[in-house]
Amino acid sequence: MELNPFLPLLTPSSEGTPFEFECELETIYWLNLHLRIPTRILIRYAEFSALSFAELFDKSVRLPWNQYICKDTVLNIRTTCRKSKLYHSDAVTQRIHEAIQSNLGCKLQLASSDDQSQLSKQQLIIVRLFHDHLTISIDSSGNPLYMRGYKQTSAKAPLRENLAAAIITASGWQPQYPLFDPFCGS
């Protein structure tokens, strides 16, 4: 299995994500480069309770955003709110955006929700607010990992690369045996 070296670090997650673990930044680089199955790798950046917009802003503005966000970055903030006093996801997104700008001391463009054209130039920030508990995650992968690689020409594939890799891994296939690909890799 591709995560065997990391099994001692992995713990089940209650948020529906398959794995959660702690590691160094260098390990995240390695994971993004070598893993075939994940779509993206998120860095759990902050967790705190937020019962009001003022509290949300105050706690968000104190985070060291300069560790992951440059001053010319276009932000793509995706927010979901469930069973919380702060239920308006656009207002939560606005407060997080304002907090980041205030912290960095500059204006940052906020990508519109329908602007998917320049994903590689955007920094994805995922904000989840559930039962008044806020979690901020920063995408470390850029484009989805199934889009990586140099492909001059390609056809529309019946499966994404990471889903195909997951199926092959789950099948128990070993590299020393031939693999028959009925789709011929599209």
Predicted regions located by residue number:
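Flexible, glycine/proline-enriched loop segments at strand-loop-helix junctions
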Residues: 85-87, 151-158, 169-170
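Beta-sheet entry/capping signal
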Residues: 124, 133-135, 178-179
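Class I SAM-dependent transferase core
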Residues: 134-159
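Conserved S-adenosyl-L-methionine
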Residues: 159-186
